Amino acid sequence: MVHFTAEEKAIITSLWAKVNVEETGGEALGRLLVVYPWTQRFFDNFGNLSSASAIMGNPKVKAHGKKVLSSLGEAVTHMDDLKDAFAHLSELHCDRLHVDPENFRLLGNVLVIVLAHHFGREFTPQVQAAWKKLMSAVAIALGHKYH
Amino acid sequence: FPHLGACLDEAQLLGHGRRMLEAVGVAVRHMDHLRAALSPLADLHGQVLRVDPANFPLLIQCFQVLLASHLQDEFTVEMQAAWDKFLTGVAVVLTEKYR
């Protein structure tokens, strides 16, 4: 199990407190769909995904992005027991959604870039390291129930 | 980077980083002929340095984090898509001569 130091937890929670979950979620999911277009395969019923601006402005993308990022908020408050916290979502993504775990890593990477984009110089190497560690741990937790 | 030792010397780090960025500059100027332009570097990485191919995505990620945090508003989704595609293409060329 991944262990987070007190310092890492402080870095993660203090940045998270300043994150606009609704906007950041939509931004991250939108960027995933634009930068890695094959990920659009999971969102056939989302309507217009024909261009970057269509994707970034798509209300379903924004809504789903908010949902995904809210789950990540769960991760921030359960850093010591991510496997349990994400057990249900792991089963969902494997058994019903059939999402390859590689996509969790892609989204995690996109989110780190979105955070860097928002926070600028405040997103120091230490902050990046802490968040990258959390994203990797969440990806592992989400893949845990795969069979 | 064994030649940098356990304690990273800032000057060496910056110097090495600069060399890498200059190589990215070469790639930018030869986007349609990456294989030819980066051939010597592909030889170096594949036969001499033998950098683990898994490291390229890590560096690409760090590079984009840097672009995002420095450029902020300018780092639009289109810019991210273009740079991700470009850097991935560079990494493919640099790891093509591994075997």
Swiss-Prot record, chain A:
What InterPro entries would the database entry show? Globin, Globin-like_sf, Globin/Proto, Hemoglobin_b, Hemoglobin_oxygen_transport
UniProt keywords (A-Z) are: Heme, Iron, Metal-binding, Oxygen transport, Transport
Residue intervals of the Globin domain? 3-147
| Superkingdom of origin organism | Eukaryota
Please list the GO terms describing molecular function.
haptoglobin binding; heme binding; hemoglobin alpha binding; metal ion binding; organic acid binding; oxygen binding; oxygen carrier activity; peroxidase activity
Q: Name one GO biological process term.
A: hydrogen peroxide catabolic process
Which is a Gene Ontology cellular component entry for this protein?
hemoglobin complex
Which Pfam families does the annotation name? Globin (PF00042)
Give a brief account of the tissues where this protein occurs. Answer: Red blood cells.
**Positions with a binding annotation for heme b:** H64, H93
Family stated for the protein in its record:
Belongs to the globin family.
Which PANTHER family is this protein grouped with? HEMOGLOBIN FAMILY MEMBER (PTHR11442), HEMOGLOBIN SUBUNIT EPSILON-2 (PTHR11442:SF35)
Q: How does it assemble?
A: Heterotetramer of two alpha chains and two gamma chains in fetal hemoglobin (Hb F).
What is the documented function of this protein? Gamma chains make up the fetal hemoglobin F, in combination with alpha chains.
| Protein name in UniProt | Hemoglobin subunit gamma
Which source organism?
A: Cephalopachus bancanus (Western tarsier)
The protein's gene is named: HBG
